[in-house]
Design a protein with these regions (language model features):
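Short aromatic/hydrophobic "clamp" motif used to bind/position activated sugar donors
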Residues: 27
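Active-site-adjacent helix/loop segment of glycosyltransferases
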Residues: 148-246, 252-256, 260, 268-271
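The conserved acidic donor/metal-binding loop of glycosyltransferases
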Residues: 31-35
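Conserved nucleotide-sugar donor-binding
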Residues: 23-24, 102-113
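Glycine-rich, basic loop-to-helix element that forms the pyrophosphate-binding segment
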Residues: 6-22, 43, 100
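Short, flexible, basic/aromatic active-site loop/helix in glycosyltransferases
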Residues: 57-63, 73-96, 100-102, 111, ...
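Conserved donor NDP-sugar-binding/catalytic core segment of glycosyltransferases
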Residues: 39-71, 146
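Catalytic donor/gating beta->alpha subdomain of glycosyltransferases that bind UDP-sugars
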Residues: 63, 111, 117-180
């Protein structure tokens, strides 16, 4: 085991340090806030040995603590409506996808596409995988490659994470617009809907009423289905509120990132 220094103290820079120092044929990314299974490395290697250049697999969420609120936060995180529109979050059959969590990469890929872009903050995976696809490589998904990610244990930490994710998506979309799918911007559209409805209130309440009814019914339905399919605890009644906070935080972050991205884009290309 070799411990390397990461002077810039950001994930993308740290991975670049590791890639430069690596002597093997493959690079395997393992994040903090995650847990890998016993055969995780072996199953990655098997897929690469079958001729693939990049691979990964499902990444269910887990919790560190077994208190009721943590369990409810996990349900919010797991819920398709609450988070996670990427293919790698769902257990599906073997296929090619646009992105994976904790991927294994043949080292030669980085000789062709370059290292990770250290300017893009929290969305280094999106940027990297976009350039991988752009250069003609495919990303292989296999159910056998299983790892877990720990859900943020408190509401504040979860909302901070969602805001930051949305912020960097909005910001980096000015430079890498094709690195993100339309689904990444759904919370942003939701926030725009709220702003538009509020602006229209002096003229009509129709838009605000329609938004509240549609969103309210949807979150209530999601909550009921979650309660039916899981062991009930009282904190589950907070799911509609938590979903709103998650969506609003993510969407607000995207809005702020998009606005700040105009000036950031100029600085990005100057460097």
């Amino acid at each position: 085991v070799v411990l390397l220094k990461n002077p810039k103290v950001i994930l993308s820079a740290g991975m670049n340090v590791g890639i430069k120092a690596a002597r093997g044929e493959c690079i395997l990314k393992v994040d903090c806030h995650s847990h890998i299974t016993e055969n995780f490395i072996e199953n990655n290697v098997k897929v690469i040995e079958n001729g693939e250049y990049v691979c990964g697999g499902p990444r269910p969420n887990i919790i560190e603590n077994e208190d009721n609120l943590s369990k409810t936060l996990l349900l919010v995180e797991e819920n398709m409506f609450g988070s996670g529109i990427a293919n790698y979050r769902k257990q599906t059959s073997k296929q090619y996808v646009s992105s994976v969590f904790q991927g294994m990469y043949k080292k030669e890929i980085f000789d062709k596409i370059g290292l990770l872009d250290e300017k893009v903050g929290r969305v280094e995976d999106n940027e990297l995988h976009y350039r991988i696809r752009k250069n003609g490589y495919k990303i292989r998904y296999s159910n056998d490659i299983l790892s877990y990610q720990y859900t943020r244990p408190t509401v504040n930490r979860m909302l901070k994470q969602k805001y930051s994710n949305g912020y960097w998506i909005g910001k980096v979309s000015h430079v890498y617009p094709k690195a993100f799918s339309i689904f990444h911007f759904v919370p942003f559209v939701f926030v725009l809907g709220i702003i538009f409805s509020l602006l229209m209130l002096p003229l009509t309440k129709l838009f605000a009423v329609l938004l509240v009814i549609a969103y309210g019914l949807f979150t209530i339905l999601v909550t009921l289905m979650t309660i039916i399919n899981n062991k009930f605890n009282a904190t589950m009644l907070l799911i509609p509120i938590l979903l709103f906070l998650v969506h609003f935080s993510y969407g607000l972050g995207t809005l702020v990132g998009l606005v700040k991205g105009f000036s950031w884009k100029k600085e990005y290309y100057k460097e």
